[in-house]
Amino acid sequence: MLVLSCILNVIAGAGLLILGYKHYRNTRELKRLRKLSSEKKRITSDLLLASQIQKSMMPLGHRILDGVEGYGTLVPAREIGGDLFDYAIRDGKLYMCIGDVCGKGAPAGMLMAYAHSMIWSLTISETNPARIVTSLNNLACKDNVSCTFFTLFYGVLDLATGCMQYCNAGHNPPYILSDKLTMLDCDPNQPIGPVEDAEFTLQEITLSPGSTIFLYTDGLTEANNTEEREFGPERTEKVLEDCVKRQLKPKDIVDTVTAAVHHFTEHAEQSDDLTMLAIRYR
């Protein structure tokens, strides 16, 4: 009987040890999960703030500047996007740009912010688009050990004459909507970042009053549906041709293209930033 009692006491003690260990393990796991939850909330909050700051750098929505009407949208695939666009008027000229950084998320967003600030810094002392893009490329090449790059379209429109000088660095050629739809002729310059001292060509076109410039990133043409088919340039042009026939204003053009993309992609996950900018020359 004494032996049995000892055995039972040992078993009971072992049970208490097991219960105590489980309680300790559960408590430690709960603390770890709480810490992870707190860290996740902090990261989410930081990303939200970064996204708000990023969007504040761009002229989202509808604007009218000296009779020039513009409308732009940016829908990032993640909290922070790698696309950029901007436009402003100074000394009778309309400066415009749109770009797409390779990659997504925070790294792409940081490069986008750097490129955005440098573009306008260079514009203070220079109006030639090719020279601005060349200077931007040389700056981007410094200490670029990761070989990060981005595409960019940069244009300067003389509001008095309608003459637009522009330089395209590997970006999707814009469209001109007037009495017909035309893809802007763009030389195949390389993107910004990989090669220092690269040459970028200057091009020129004269726009007629009432023309609309439609700029976009490849998040439009490469938008996938649930069957992994791309929206593509043909669908893009078909929608824009309809906009020409209906003589739509910048906001209506962007909204029409956006609706067409959403209808095409349905419930497919967005894989890339979607950015569009339409500017109507008075």
Question: What is each model feature region?
Answer:
Residues 1-30:
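Alpha-helical transmembrane signal-anchor helices
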Residues 5, 9-12, 203-215, 220-282:
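C-terminal catalytic subdomain
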Residues 24, 105-106, 110, 223-224:
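Charged alpha-helical signal-transmission linkers that cap and connect PAS-family sensory domains
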Residues 31-214, 263-282:
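… and, occasionally, acidic/histidine-rich disordered N-termini of signaling adaptors
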